Amino acid sequence: MANKPSAEELKKNLSEMQFYVTQNHGTEPPFTGRLLHNKRDGVYHCLICDAPLFHSQTKYDSGCGWPSFYEPVSEESIRYIKDLSHGMQRIEIRCGNCDAHLGHVFPDGPQPTGERYCVNSASLRFTDGENGEEING
């Protein structure tokens, strides 16, 4: 795991929602994320450590209210944790580099993987493939 900034540094540099989601395993309200409707070509990175997580070509509209992807950039980019909270059985996804909470993965996505990586915008930074512009979720 990468060296992660201290909680004080993160609180100073992140919005309340970004801190809540990435550090406290929170979930942003559905249909509110800044990157939900982003359709530009580029790469979605971890907001905390900037590790690449998802290519825009794997993003799709699942209708669930959070950015959805069917595949990460690599197996190493995501860490999978069994999550039994809230009376449900789910698989939590975290950044494979810094362990920031991203969201959950579900087995109801499109082909070719059949998986839906349901990710909080607040855990992501998008880098535009054409002009390099960065947008924090």
Curated annotation (Swiss-Prot):
> Where would one find the signal peptide in this protein?
none
Occurrences of domain MsrB (ranges) = 7-129
Cofactor, how bound (note): Binds 1 zinc ion per subunit. The zinc ion is important for the structural integrity of the protein.
- Active-site residues per Swiss-Prot or TrEMBL entry: C118
Keywords per UniProt: Metal-binding, Oxidoreductase, Zinc
Q: Name one GO biological process term.
A: response to oxidative stress
* Residues annotated as binding Zn(2+): C46, C49, C95, C98
Q: Which cofactor does it need?
A: Zn(2+)
Q: Which GO-annotated molecular functions does the record name?
A: iron ion binding; L-methionine-(R)-S-oxide reductase activity; peptide-methionine (R)-S-oxide reductase activity; zinc ion binding
Enzyme nomenclature, EC number: 1.8.4.12
One Pfam annotation reads SelR
Read off the InterPro entries from this record.
Answer: Met_Sox_Rdtase_MsrB (IPR028427), Met_Sox_Rdtase_MsrB_dom (IPR002579), Mss4-like_sf (IPR011057)
Catalyses:
L-methionyl-[protein] + [thioredoxin]-disulfide + H2O = L-methionyl-(R)-S-oxide-[protein] + [thioredoxin]-dithiol
User: Known SUPFAM superfamilies for this protein?
Assistant: Mss4-like
One Gene Ontology cellular component: cytosol
Question: Which HAMAP family does the protein's record reference?
Answer: MsrB
> What is this protein's record name?
Peptide methionine sulfoxide reductase MsrB
Write down the species: Escherichia coli (strain K12)
Q: Which gene encodes it?
A: msrB
